[in-house]
Amino acid sequence: MKEYDAYYMGNAESKVIYLTFDCGYENGNTEPILDALKKHNAPAAFFVVGHYINTAPEIVKRMVDEGHIVANHTNHHYSMPSVTYSTDVFNKELTDVEDKFKELTGKDMPKFFRPPMGQYSQKSLAMTKDLGYKTVFWSFAYGDYEPSNQPSLYEGKKNILDHLHDGSILLLHAISKTNADILGEVIDEARKSGYEFYLLP
């Protein structure tokens, strides 16, 4: 993956954790997540689709204002290997999000990309790299993505803390009420174990 500027974890010899959130739509849990990050002075990356920028512009601006990375999760959440047949279609999935972000914030979107559903091919990775992106996968994810079927607070916290390791990239979903409720405690417990939270490298 290195040849395509793609990675799924950070430095495995450093007690560092990278928080990342995928944002497909807003259901009221992102602001409590931002509140917890602010209270505990922890940075994160938010991978947003085009629809999210359209429908939650003030939250996106808050992410930027509070020092987080807002990065690209495509415009329509397509499986990117399925659109490699057309360079124009493929590129537009990323550049449309860049344009929306620039129009909203006046800033260039950071060149980090998370492929929808984690799906990729050698060709899609190469095409993403050609646009100047690093592709960011993850070393941990769990079943937090169904709002109507959320893990309990105990299950969510235990699942995350039991799987921490040096260089962890955590994939969490911002639609998860469990994540919003436990995030502050997770940050505190991780720090007690010697971890610190950094922005993506």
Which residues does each PLM region occupy?
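Active-site beta-loop-alpha junctions enriched in small/polar residues
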Residues: G24, V49-H51, N75, P116-G118, ...
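Active-site beta->alpha N-cap acidic-glycine motif
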Residues: M1-Y85, T95-E103, K107-P110, E185
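Structural recognition of the beta-strand scaffold that forms the well-ordered cores
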Residues: I17-T20, A44-V48, I69-N72, K111-P115, ...
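Soluble non-cytosolic domains of exported or imported proteins
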Residues: G24-E31, N54, T84-N91, G118-Q119, ...
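His/Asp/Glu-enriched short active-site or ligand-binding loop at hydrolase and phosphoryl-transfer sites
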Residues: Q119, L125-H163, Y195-P201
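Soluble catalytic domains of enzymes that build or remodel membrane lipids, polysaccharides, and related
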Residues: F90-D96, M127
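Catalytic grooves of carbohydrate-active enzymes
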Residues: L164-P201
